[in-house]
Amino acid sequence: MAGVNNRVKITNDIELKDRLVAINRVTKVTKGGRTFSFSAIVVVGNEEGIIGWGLGKAGEVTAAIAKGVESAKKNLTRVPVLKGTVPHEQSAKFGGAEVFIKPASHGTGVVAGGAMRAVLESVGVTDVLAKSKGSSNPHNLVKATIMALGEMRDARMIAQNRGISVEKVFRG
């Protein structure tokens, strides 16, 4: 929806947990030989609807992860989570990666793979069905998953945007 801002300003009272999605060793070939560095994709979230992702690059693995966490903290988004699942089905595409997220009943667990699982667990979703198609590149999967979650709307948000009551959203 146009005009909806889900950005979150970071404050000290938000306790964020970070998850490492992928780490990659990168080689730069120079006249003097090979230079190695590392890139890390990190997802941070408070497991209550706030999520962010970041990319860190450095000569050491720990420094790359730390830079990724700092980058993720600057890129936070709020996502609606209802009773441990998502409000409705949603799909999104980023690059060659396409994701499909569907709500699940209590006790199902997080049925998702790789990078999608890290994002969904960080946002606080405990029961969801998710499928990725196309590219399995973790960069694109993380971005597509966060894009799909960012497009989610619960009944309260819809009522607020339309200027009507929550009951009227359901009854028409």
Curated annotation (Swiss-Prot):
One of its GO terms (biological process) is translation. Keywords: Ribonucleoprotein, Ribosomal protein, RNA-binding, rRNA-binding. Pfam families: Ribosomal_S5, Ribosomal_S5_C. InterPro entries: Ribosomal_Su5_D2-typ_SF, Ribosomal_uS5, Ribosomal_uS5_bac-type, Ribosomal_uS5_C, Ribosomal_uS5_N, Ribosomal_uS5_N_CS, Ribsml_uS5_D2-typ_fold_subgr. GO terms for cellular component: small ribosomal subunit. It comes from the Bacteria. The keyword Flavoprotein does not apply. Residues 16-79 form the S5 DRBM domain. GO terms for molecular function: rRNA binding; structural constituent of ribosome. The N-terminal domain interacts with the head of the 30S subunit; the C-terminal domain interacts with the body and contacts protein S4. The interaction surface between S4 and S5 is involved in control of translational fidelity. Part of the 30S ribosomal subunit. Contacts proteins S4 and S8. PANTHER family: MITOCHONDRIAL RIBOSOMAL PROTEIN S5 (PTHR48277:SF1). With S4 and S12 plays an important role in translational accuracy. Located at the back of the 30S subunit body where it stabilizes the conformation of the head with respect to the body. Belongs to the universal ribosomal protein uS5 family. This is Small ribosomal subunit protein uS5. It comes from Bacteroides fragilis (strain ATCC 25285 / DSM 2151 / CCUG 4856 / JCM 11019 / LMG 10263 / NCTC 9343 / Onslow / VPI 2553 / EN-2). The lineage of its organism: Bacteria, Pseudomonadati, Bacteroidota, Bacteroidia, Bacteroidales.
